[in-house]
Regions:
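Short intrinsically disordered terminal tails
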Residues: 1-3, 176-177
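C-terminal cap/substrate-recognition subdomain and adjoining C-terminal extension
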Residues: 71-177
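Alpha-helical substrate-recognition element adjacent to the catalytic core
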Residues: 2-99
Length: 177
């Protein structure tokens, strides 16, 4: 069975407040947390969680360690949080890839993705747009598939939706129930 690492951003991917209504997601330290999930968010998270071949990671600058509230909302197991990584880990990645110009601040997500990718068969990263470093890394490493949830012509089509769900499911070898 082919092992796939999935890096999943939240804002602009499964949470799109500019387009969808706000709803209660979970509580954290007695505070209510709200999000605006895309219509396919819960089904998608559950399908990923059921897969034995996918090792999912949250990759969110905004939610960071609180990303796991989305697992609670979707009634799935908590996933690991990939971002941020330590400066020691960042420097190890930068030493391993001297051909890629990597900045510790600007390219933090790319550094985290490289760090957590290890020796898996395939890497799928779903994000609302990618930095140049991620694009360059994907060109160097044929295991990497980058899927942007930005729609260049229609800004209301941000997030996981009918325009990109087939590509996402094909990359992950998934099917909705």
């Amino acid at each position: 069975m082919q092992k796939i690492v999935l890096f999943l951003d939240i804002d602009g991917v499964i949470n799109v407040p500019e387009v969808y209504s706000s709803e209660f997601i979970s509580c954290y330290q007695r505070f209510d947390l709200y999000g605006s999930p895309v219509p396919l968010a819960r089904q998608f998270l559950q399908a990923v969680d059921r897969s034995e071949s996918i090792k999912p990671f949250w990759m969110s600058k905004g939610w960071r360690k609180h990303a796991i509230v989305w697992n609670q909302w979707a009634q799935t197991r908590p996933w690991r949080v990939a971002y941020p990584i330590s400066f020691v880990q960042m420097r190890e990645v930068m030493a391993k890839y001297p051909g890629i110009f990597l900045d510790e601040v600007e390219d933090g997500k790319t550094l985290a993705a490289i760090w957590h990718s290890g020796n898996v068969d395939r890497v799928v990263w779903i994000e609302d747009g990618f930095p140049e470093s991620a694009i360059f890394w994907a060109k160097l490493d044929n295991r990497v598939t980058l899927i942007s949830t930005l729609h260049e012509c229609d800004r209301t089509q941000i997030g996981i939706n009918a325009e990109n769900i087939d590509r996402i499911f094909a990359a992950l070898n998934l099917k909705l129930d």
